[in-house]
Amino acid sequence: MKNSISRFIIISLVLMCLMGALIYKLHEVTIVEGAQYAEAAANTSTSSIDIKGTRGRILDRNGVVLAYSKNSYNVEFLRDADNRTDYDSATYTDSLIKAIKIIEDGGGKTIDTSYIRLGEDGKLKYEWGVKSRAAQVARYKNFCQSMGFNISESLKKNEKIEDKSKWDTSTWPTAEEAYTKLRALWFIPEDLPFEDANKVISIRQEVLLNNYRAYEPITIAYDVSMEVVAEIKLRADELTGLQTSQSTTRVYPRGTTAAHILGYLGRTATEEMVKEKGYSYDDYIGVSGIEYTMEEYLTGSTNERKGERVLEKNKNGSAIRELSYTPAKDGDDVMLTIDINLQTVVEKALEDLIAKIDEKEEKQLLERYADYEKATNDDVEGIKTAKTGAAVVMNVNTGQVLAMASYPSFNPNWFIAGLSPEQNQELFNSEFSVETTPTRNKAISTKLAPGSIFKMATGVAAAAEGVLDINERISCDYEYIIKYTDENGNEKTIEQNAPKCHLNSRSKIGQHANQTLADAIKNSCNYYFCEAAYRLGIDKLNEWAGKFGLTSRTGIELTGETEGIVGGQKVLFDNTLTGEDGTLDIANQKTSLPGLVYRKLKETLVKFVESRNAEVDEEAINRCAKRLMELQDGDITNKGPEIRRIISEEIDIPEGITQMRKDWINSISSLLNEIQWKPTQTIRAGFGQGTTLVTPVAVARYVSALANRGTVYDVHIVDKVMDSSGSTVKNVAPSVYNQIEISDDIWDAVSSGMKGVVSPEDGGTASSAFKDYPEFRKKYIDTEMFGGKTGSAQIGRRAKNIDIENTSWFVTFAPREQPEIAIVICVPYGLSGSSSVPAIVDILTYYFGQSENAAPENLVAINGLTE
């Protein structure tokens, strides 16, 4: 019993000692050391850093890299949100001035995004970087609010107006006022010149515009040298807010080659892209070309691609340890359909061709200057010569683009570093660039009259619709005069503006006698296709142009494509087209003629009102002009009563007055007559003139359909998309836009006619142009390897003995029996269609040469196997 009590006492004492020790330790941890832990916790923090994936590459069809991102270093500026005193602001400005000098001494340059610019007159002005007034006002507002300028009273009034273009910004700070305020706000030294001060303003402006993401640094210089990186790090103590970071820089290793296809990048992220997709305002994103259209695949900067690094930092902001790391996902690679070697050949061929034509035209102008002066009494400099052009090579069996050239070109690498004033001048503001628009892809965005290359479409349509047999023989009569029977059974003719055949003389019409469809294509006889178009009618001609894909976008994965037009009342002028305000839409008509007529009508109506000494009401004049134009529906009936009624209702001129002033009604009727489709316009459309306009890329798929006998493909320049491991993310398979089902006899006639165009034996219109290429002629023409068609669409004045302002077209497909490719060459102001023959020779020589080298008998045997 005693032993049990003793054991109990001993155990109790031990437990009490242990409990005491535990209580003491708990006291020490919570009370004594707690303050230390609390202090340590207060001196540490966590921060997360977004990690962006590398932008994907752009490759040609064989895997050759056309665009990639290389590792580089940037200089960044991060303003501590807690440091907002005047002293802090002055310190940041001093640091930026020093950093800018370091960067520039190291061969780099800082961002130049300030909205404040120095005009040619020496006065400060705003440049908002957007064209529309509404967009300018939106940026102006954001700028003022971000910079802390008080415009609240003005906004109260303006925000009641939905249309920002109508906002009154007259009380907002001028560029001069803003510049003065910002220099003072940021303590920019008074002796610092404008050019250097504005560099500081650019950086500080970006910080405030990015204020709601103030934790993100602003990149102030891209792709700087290692010397700059070392200097920034060495002087870190005096460069408050400055740091360097590893990044990537986009590189286009082939410079100007394929520039219009690849496009370029810019720091153009919108607020929506930043908030919804996770982009930073510093991110470079696609602005044009493949870089733009395939942005969602190429980018590594969106939320779904970005990774994250979570760091623990001490009170000085230095990282203590990494708490977590989520790797970023790189952007996908985009493989194109183009062959970069063929692309290079095509671009060189086009550039050489334009230079050759331009030289020939300049020589012709000098030789015939006297005749020009007599004919026009004008300055010879008014005539334009070849300066631009486009070329497309397409796989006729898939619709894939193998090469696409636009001249002149540009270097997309320039946009990465930011355009220098000299580069900006060269691309956008020089006399040459204004005339030639180097950054515009003319293969998809330029619409031009096709001229004679459209004749195959007219011929196929007429034969397929049964209004003309392919073997029917039609003889040229030089001038095509429309003959018809009126409602009273009387024979009538329309001789005004009668189109002529290209023979240029009635004495030569025997050369175009008894022509079949194939003959007419070979001879390029305007008369024949006027007859075909007249029988067919404009509606059917429009329909068939649509079937060939000439009046719609092709679907190519590039920005800026426009669609072609042929003709008809709705094309010339559509009186049913209305705008957002419910009235007739003039601006979005398919041709420019309605705009001209609208202005003329308003001028005429103003004269009517002023002749009566009445006050001119501009809104009433506008309404009246539009209502008058709505009368033009293509019907030829007399519209006099309706004209008088509308004038009376809108501008208060009684019908009794206009009844007496028949000259007034006649002048209105004459203007309305300008926007009425006429039979003479139908026949001109038949040989690719008049209102007919097409793009080179649409012509390429049209010629492809002629070659493959009826399959009109959607056009593609993207082959597939692959992730960073090489797995296919998206495959772009050939797709059919339309299938034309007609008899083989019609296709045979077209093929035969196009063969004849280049054949010396057949005396085709382009045959003589190949005389300077005897080897090519012997190897490829004499063996009937390809067929072609020239086009010389008139686009300018035509003085005596001077006829150079024509668009030069040459289209071809090859080989003729089993076609593989279609080629389109287009040179505005290019003299004549046959002028483009040198480029065709260069491209086909390369293409046929590559095919011959790839023939089985020419392949090299390795270890007994043929590769």
Language-model regions, residue ranges each:
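Membrane-proximal periplasmic segments of bacterial cell-envelope enzymes
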Residues: 1-331, 335, 340-390, 396, ...
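Beta-lactam-recognizing serine transpeptidase/beta-lactamase-like catalytic domain environment
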Residues: 67-68, 73, 310-327, 338, ...
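A generic structural signal for short coil/turn motifs at secondary-structure boundaries
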Residues: 83-87, 358, 530, 797, ...
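Short conserved micro-motifs at the rims of enzyme active sites and ligand-binding pockets
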Residues: 271-274, 797-801, 824, 834-837
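Conserved helix-loop functional segments at active or binding sites
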Residues: 352-359, 674, 708, 756, ...
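Short, glycine/acidic-rich hinge or "gate" loops at secondary-structure transitions
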Residues: 361-372, 472-476, 539, 716, ...
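Short, gly/Ser/Thr-rich active-site loops of penicillin-recognizing serine hydrolases
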Residues: 727-735, 841-867
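Amphipathic oligomerization regions
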Residues: 828-847
